[in-house]
Amino acid sequence: FECVIYDGTTDGSAISDADCAALVWKCKPSGIRDVGTSSAYTPGADGLNHLVHFTRPTVVPVYATFAVVQNSADGVVNPLIDLRDAVLAFARDKYNVGTDVVWSSLFRPAFVRGIYDITDLFIGTAPSPSGTANIIIDDHSIAVFDSSRITVT
């Protein structure tokens, strides 16, 4: 039994190890051994402290570069920011621990009002991406998008 706990930060600082252990202990099946790369003690109903294991995922930063053609007739003030925000919202909803970043899936949220066409889309795990291949995320990692890593021109 392994819990992979992502707290929304790159260093795991939002939720303490003790709080993670308490959460795992609360929902852990009885008699099933827990495993993981991190651990902490938490009190049980028996009054004893129990060592609980869990894993924090490796954060994989995702960089994306969109080249677009705008449609000024739509009257949208800043469709480039709207596109970036739509991709971020999509990523927050879609990408969990172990979920691959599928290159073609990023076209869907990118078509916001004011965008006529997407002429190029590149993704990668380093600045200035040039790839169109999917980003494979293993079971102990999570793809994380950030507005500072999405470029729209």
Segments from the language model and where they lie:
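An aromatic-glycine-centered, glycine-rich loop/turn in mixed alpha/beta architecture
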Residues: G75-T153
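Carbohydrate-recognition loop of C-type lectin domains
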Residues: F1-T99
